Amino acid sequence: FEALSWLLDNWHLTAAGKNGRERAVLESAINTLLRGFSALSAGGADAWVLISAATRKDLRNPKGNEEVLAVDVSGFAPEGDDSAALFIVKAYRLGWRRVVAFAWRGQRFCGSGLGASSGGFRIDTYGNPGDYLGSGLDGAHLYVHGAAQDQLAQIMKSGKLVIYGDV
């Protein structure tokens, strides 16, 4: 996973340059890898666990060895009560400290709504997160492994926003 992420983040340094086809292959490989993790409902044995819009009702606090919540955001609403952004806030409030959210296709407000003093929480995004990413950020670290849209980090008080692609 780390090697694929590095390649995705540094693809402009490779011989492929800015070839979108190679980037799409890397994103597909990352999505396939993340979708291969055990479901959160399986319970506590694995460090990385997977949840999606279809299984969102299974969200709970981390147990046992669980450290990273991989969230397939492809089925979530772009914004509102059923959005990926609010789902990530719920995960944070339940005690998750790292979320890897992937398959973004324009869903908005990632990293917003975490509340004051969200230090120690990390979100990694893969795909194409929508605008208002990191707005209201107050301590959390947000890593965008790709391009980001407009309205980034509005009213950002503290934390970190790293974008490995274009803005």
Which role does the model predict for each range below?
Residues F1-V167:
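Charge-rich, low-hydrophobicity low-complexity segments
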